[in-house]
C-alpha cells in the first residue's frame, strides 16, 4: 500500500520540466523558454537522410546562451548495423566536441524497424551506443511506451530510457509529452 501524500511524493520525486525540439517547431524563442523555467532541452541533431536538423546550430547556441542544459536525439531510420553506425558517426561529427549535459538519445520509434525483431534492434542500439560513448558522450534510448513494453528487449533496459507518454487530455498545449527516465 502506498501511503505517500502529495508533499512526500514531491519531496521524493523531483519534478523536472524539459522540451524536445526539432525543425518541426520552427524558430524557438529561447529567452521565453528560459523564462518559463525549462530545466532542459533535447534537440534533434539529424533528420531523415542523415542531414543536420536545419535549426540545430541555432538551438544549441541559444540553449548555451540562456544556460539551458542540453542533450540531443537521433530519430533512427536505420535497418542495418552499418546504417545505424553511419547515423552514430554523423551525430558525433555534427556535435564536433560540443558539451552536452544530457545524453545523446537514440530515438527508436520507426515502425519499419519493428520487423527486424528485438534481437536485431538490440544489436543495432548497442552498435550506436559504442560509437557515441567512445566519443565521450552519455547514451540513452528514447521511445514510446508501446516500444518499451513490446519491442525493446530486456538486454537494452540496462540503459537510461526517456519514454514518451503523450497526454490524453488536451489542456490547451500542443505537442506536449511527458518523458521519464526508467
Which stretches of residues belong to each language-model region?
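Hydrophobic faces of well-ordered beta-strands that scaffold small-molecule active sites
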Residues: 17-21, 41-43, 70-74, 104-106, ...
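Surface-exposed substrate-engagement region within the catalytic domains
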Residues: 89-104, 111-182
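Conserved, mostly hydrophobic/aromatic
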Residues: 19, 33, 63, 106, ...
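Short, well-structured secondary-structure segments
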Residues: 39-53, 60-79, 103-105
